[in-house]
Amino acid sequence: MKAFLLSLATLLACIVLTESAPHSADVREEAFDALVRSYLQAVQRDSHMENLTCAECQGVTERNCTLGERQVQCNPGEVCTTLEAFNLDTGTTTVTRGCFNITGLNCGDNPGCGALNTTGNIQSCDQFCCNTSLCNAGTLTTVTPQTTDGNTTTEAPTSTEPPTNASTEAPTSTEPPTNASTEAPTSTEPPTNASTEAPTTTEAPTTTEAPTTTEAPTTTETPTTTETPTTTAAPTTTETPTTTAAPTTTPAPTTTPAPTTPFFCNATLAGLSGTFTSPNFQLITQTG
């Protein structure tokens, strides 16, 4: 029992000593802060003899900050600095340049980062310091405007030439009708029966009123052939076609009633009775 109590007391003593001793991480952080402060003090000592000229601006990006940049005269002992703070709320990086009396590199110790972090949304904050005039000024490189050469593609309107071809080709299609009109008079040489058809061709010129093309009037030469109809006295012979009544002799096939003999169907009918529609045959039903 005594051994157990002694072990417990020893354990408690070790816990107290461990908790009271400073952690190694804290020791390293304090050493780093001290090193940073000594470096900044050295920078301030080197620059206190002159007033630096620094760039001053603020923007959501480095380019926006550089576009609104202006030169300012710093107070004695101040250096040129650049702060880059990431705003977690808006998802943007705020870039600030100007003159600051820097006391530390952490956002909590730096007055510039502290001023930006009034809302508490700054996730990270980095700062850069230098001790020469305009050492924190930004630069812009704008080479992209050379892409304006693409506007030379305005030559495309030259494609308006094809429509002129379509308009000139259409009138050429009016020439074939003149050939058709010249062929009709050649048909007057056959029998006078064909001459009766020629007057019917005079109806075709009436269709020439629809086309607006001026070439259609060239068909007016065909009416000059109307002098040939003076031979229309011959059409009195057109009565001869009445001889076409001769085909009325076609009833000769009526001699087919010869097969008056009954026609027997050797197959069994599907029904009890039937009707055969042919006038030349009789349907005889067989039972059994």
From Swiss-Prot:
Stretch forming the signal peptide: 1-20
Expression (tissue specificity): Component of the acid-insoluble and acid-soluble organic matrix of the aragonitic skeleton (at protein level).
Bias (Polar residues) ranges: 141-150
Location of the region described as Disordered in the Swiss-Prot/TrEMBL record: 141-260
Family annotation (CDD domains): TFP_LU_ECD_TRP (cd23582)
Subcellular location: Secreted
Low complexity composition bias: residue spans: 151-253
The protein, known as: Threonine-rich protein
Gene Ontology cellular-component terms listed: extracellular region
UniProtKB keywords: Secreted, Signal
